[in-house]
Amino acid sequence: MRGILILVALGAATIPQASAAPNDRQQSMIDLPLKLYQNGFNTDLVTIGTPAQATRLFVDWTWIGAYTVSTKCNHTNNAYGCLAPGQKLFNETQSTSLVNQTNLYPTRTWNPNHFFMDKDLTAVFASDIYRVGDRESRLTLQLSQLNWKASFPYPFSGIFGMSPVFKSDNMSIQAPFHQMVQQKKFHSGLTSFIYCYSDEPGYKSPSKERCNGNDGIQTLGGYHHRDIGWRGIEWINTIVFPIVNDIDFIYNPAFYNYWSIPVTKHFIGNEEQALNTTTGSAVVFDHASYGRGAAMSVASYRRLVSITNAQPVNLTMATLPNNGKQKFYSVDCDRVDSFPAVKYQFGKWRRVWSIEARHYISKAKTMDGKDVCVLNVRVIGQGENFVIGNLGENFAKDKVILFDFEKNRVGLADFRD
C-alpha cells in the first residue's frame, strides 16, 4: 500500500549544521536493514533530532521527501487529538536542533493522495539533524499536520522517500538520501535493493544471511559487487509519463517524480502481448503495496488466465495478494512449474526481464476456507493493451534493483546465487 502520512511544520536557515563525518566514512556505503510489513519495507536505522529520537521509517520509492509524523493536529501540538493511540511519532517540540522553515517553503496539501485517499495530506516544513547509521546531516523534513482523526495507528513514524529528484525541485520535496549526497555524506548517488524473500515453500529462496537476517537491504551510496550476476547491470534512463497521475498514483496537485521507464515489449512466455500505441507504455518501480503482483494489461491477464486454465475465485480480504481492482483466479498448485514467465523489455535491443511463474503465484484462502494458489497479477490501465504497471516485490525476486540519483536512471541485474 502506501500506508501513512501525517505532517507538520518548521523551518530553515542559518543554524549550526550537523558535524561532518570522517572522510573515509563519507565515501562508504550504508546498508539499510528492511523488514517487510503490510505497507511495505520499513527500517529502524534512522534517528532524528537532538537528542536523537528513534524512528521506524517506511522506505518508499514513490514518495518525494522526508515525511515525519509529528505532534501537529489542527494547528496545535495535541498529537493524539488526531493520531490513534499507540502511533509512533517524532516529537518535534522536544528537539533542540529543529529549525522552522515555513518562511522558505509554504505548507503543501495533497488531496486526493495515495496515503489518506480523500483526506488531506498536509505537510509543513522544518529542518533537523537526520542520522542514517553513522552518517548525519541537517535535512529538510515534511512534518505532518493533520486536520482529521486517524482510526488506527500506522506501522511506521515517517517516510524515507526515494523518488528521483528533478533539477527544479527544492529541498522540501527532495529524497533524504539525495539531500545527504548533496552534502557529500555519500560518495555516490547510487542506491541498490535486494530482497531475501521466503514466501515460496518448496522453492529455493535467497539466504537471509545475504540480507544480514533481514527481509531486504537498501544500500545507500552504491551496491555490493558480490550481489551482481555475471551479465552485469543494464541501465535504463527514466522518463516522465504523465498518465501515471491519471490512472496509477493519483495526487492533486500532481507530481511525476517516479522511477518510470519505457516498456517496448511485453510477453507471456514467447508470446508477445499488445502495448498501447497512443500513449506508449511504461512501468513504475514501487516495492510497497501498489507494486505487488505482476504488472499486466487487461488483455495479457486474460491470456494468462487462459494459458494456466485459471478459475475465478473469491478470496478473504486478509489473503488478497495485492490491492488491485482486477478479479483473482486460482490455478493448480502442482502445475506451477509448467506455467510461462511474464516478461518485459525496456528499450529496443535490450534484455528481456522475467517474472518466473513461481514468483507470480501466491498462496491465499477462499471465503469458504480453502487454501489455493492464485495468479498474483495487478492490472492498471485504460482499454485492453498495456499502458502502465508497477514493478515491486514479485519482479524484484532474484534481481538487484538500482537507482542512480545523479543520472536519473534505473539499473537492473541478476542477483548472484
UniProtKB/Swiss-Prot annotation:
Instruction: Please tell me which top-level EC class this enzyme sits in.
Output: hydrolase
Question: Which Pfam families does the record associate with it?
Answer: Asp
Indicate whether Glycoprotein appears among the record's keywords: yes
What's in the keyword line of the UniProt record?
A: Aspartyl protease, Disulfide bond, Glycoprotein, Hydrolase, Protease, Secreted, Signal
Q: Which residues form the Peptidase A1 domain?
A: 42-413
In the UniProt record, which residues carry a glycan?
A: 74, 91, 100, 170, 276, 314
What InterPro entries does the record point to?
Aspartic_peptidase_A1, PEPTIDASE_A1, Peptidase_aspartic_dom_sf
- Signal sequence span per UniProt? 1-20
Query: Which one GO biological process term can you cite for this protein?
Result: proteolysis
* Alphabetized PROSITE patterns for the sequence: PEPTIDASE_A1
Q: Identify the domain of life.
A: Eukaryota
Task: Give a yes or no for keyword Mitochondrion in this entry.
Answer: no
Please state where this protein is localized. Answer: Secreted
| GO MF term (any one) | aspartic-type endopeptidase activity
Q: Which GO terms describe its cellular component?
A: extracellular region
Q: Under which EC number(s) is this enzyme classified?
A: 3.4.23.-
What cystine linkages occur within this chain? 333-373
Family, according to the entry, reads as follows: Belongs to the peptidase A1 family.
Summarize the protein's role.
Answer: Probable secreted aspartic protease that supplies the fungus with nutrient amino acids. May be able to degrade the selected host's proteins involved in the immune defense.
Q: What is this protein called?
A: Probable secreted aspartic protease ARB_07536
Q: Record the organism.
A: Arthroderma benhamiae (strain ATCC MYA-4681 / CBS 112371) (Trichophyton mentagrophytes)
- What does UniProt list as this organism's lineage? Eukaryota, Fungi, Dikarya, Ascomycota, Pezizomycotina
